[in-house]
Amino acid sequence: EAFVNEVKEKEGMKLNDSIYFSLSDHIMGAISRLENGIRLQNMLLLDIKQLYHKEYEIGLELLKKVNETFEVDLSADEAGFFALHFVNAEDGGKTDSYQISIIVHQILDIVEKYYDNMEFQEDNLYYQRFLTHLKYFAQRFLHKELHYDENQELFKIIKEQYREAYGCVKMIYLMMEEEYKYAMT
């Protein structure tokens, strides 16, 4: 409780009160799993670090505190899980951060493959901006808040002048339609 209150004050975050229970419950579960020899690997850890950098740093601080207080050795994977608790509590539970991370990861995979195994420079400003756009796109997609733009003329110009990018977007569109059964316009 003290840590969450400290984060609220230090970071100026408005957190839903549900974080007190969900985070405490997660910490106790993680310690219990560790005592039973079970370690969960956070498959989205890299995405969490990139998409929710501030929350991940908070998760690392909490991880250090938990390890010291309870004299355990929880892994950095837990810091990623802790970060998601803060992300979800920040938005009052509206955001499904796990699903957003998956969608962003799927789109990044398509972009990397489409452009011949292109590797992103994670510390690049353009990459960070791209991630931010993908994150907000995924959030709007999940809440079906995508808006149709009636300006077909602009669409035609973009489609003709940026054919390669349009091809990549088409692949993303097809994946989203197939995977999530929701057609975007």
Summary of predicted features, one role per range:
Residues E1-T185:
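A cross-family "folded-core" feature that marks the main globular domain of proteins
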